[in-house]
Amino acid sequence: MTNEFHHVTVLLHETVDMLDIKPDGIYVDATLGGAGHSSYLLSQLSEKGHLYCFDQDQKAIDNAQVRLKDYIDKGMVTFIKDNFRNLKSNLEALGVSEIDGILYDLGVSSPQLDERERGFSYKQDAKLDMRMNEEASLTAYDVVNTYPYNDLVRIFFKYGEDKFSKQIARKIEQARQVKPIETTTELAEIIKSAKPAKELKKKGHPAKQIFQAIRIEVNDELGAADESIQEALDLLAVNGRISVITFHSLEDRLTKQLFKEASTADVPKGLPFIPEDLQPKVALVNRKPILPSQEELEANNRSHSAKLRVAKKIRK
């Protein structure tokens, strides 16, 4: 692994083991990141098996090409530089119409957070950016400096769930009338200035939720996850599985809802039986999310909010 792309994988064994790996199966890592999940999954495949890895960050792919070199040399890995919302079209272009399993590790990766110039973190001073795909056009700077007040309030409430969204949006509006808000530190200070003193004494950084909201907006994270997970459920072969790790309530609610819809028969109540073509195509493998062990929590602080949900395809 390259030094500049160090990433501690969360729920490593649980996420992959719950896929019930077939040695000669076809699998997808929808969120390559530091390639931790990919490396462990590939170790369980025979040379007849194959793993397709998605990431829109070229640095993640460059790192993985070094880390997974032995498997690449055996022809067991294909990298796809694209947003995972384009899952189905990319796989179909490669002749793949069915998969045995897929995993998602949603949210921003540690290297993206830690690389100052990517502009994700309120802990390091950098230009406002937050793009997971550095070739994308919309940046955090654009959101903060061009979105109307009402749109800022909407995304802060919807994606940040911050009860001071209106006050923060108003402060941003006032500040950018004087000069553009250009850096993460500037934005963090504006957010802090909008919150009452007693709120600033609470645990956690006062800018955390707003930075999350802007990042989700810049990358359309929830829209992409919604589209991709639905496509993944469709692509799964019978007995194929999907593992999804989430790190905040918005991602977890979305995943839970998609799994619930796919695992529930869409028929009126009171029918004496459910016709086979209306039976659910998916079953939940775990009704409650799997959480990190105490050992993992102590070893990796970033795992504390992680939740893993798993579902299984039961019919086409």
From Swiss-Prot:
Return any one Pfam family short name. Methyltransf_5
What GO molecular function annotations does the UniProt record carry, in alphabetical order?
rRNA (cytosine-N4-)-methyltransferase activity
Cited InterPro entries: RsmH, SAM-dep_MeTrfase_MraW_recog, SAM-dependent_MTases_sf
Ordered alphabetically, the record's keywords are: Cytoplasm, Methyltransferase, rRNA processing, S-adenosyl-L-methionine, Transferase
> Taking the first listed entry, what is the main subcellular location of this protein, grouped into a coarse class?
cytoplasm
> Which positions bind S-adenosyl-L-methionine?
35-37, 55, 84, 105, 112
- Localized where? Cytoplasm
Biological process (GO), any one: rRNA base methylation
Spell out the SUPFAM superfamilies in the cross-references. Answer: Putative methyltransferase TM0872, insert domain, S-adenosyl-L-methionine-dependent methyltransferases
Q: What does this protein do?
A: Specifically methylates the N4 position of cytidine in position 1402 (C1402) of 16S rRNA.
Name by which UniProt lists this protein? Ribosomal RNA small subunit methyltransferase H
The UniProt gene name for this protein comes to rsmH
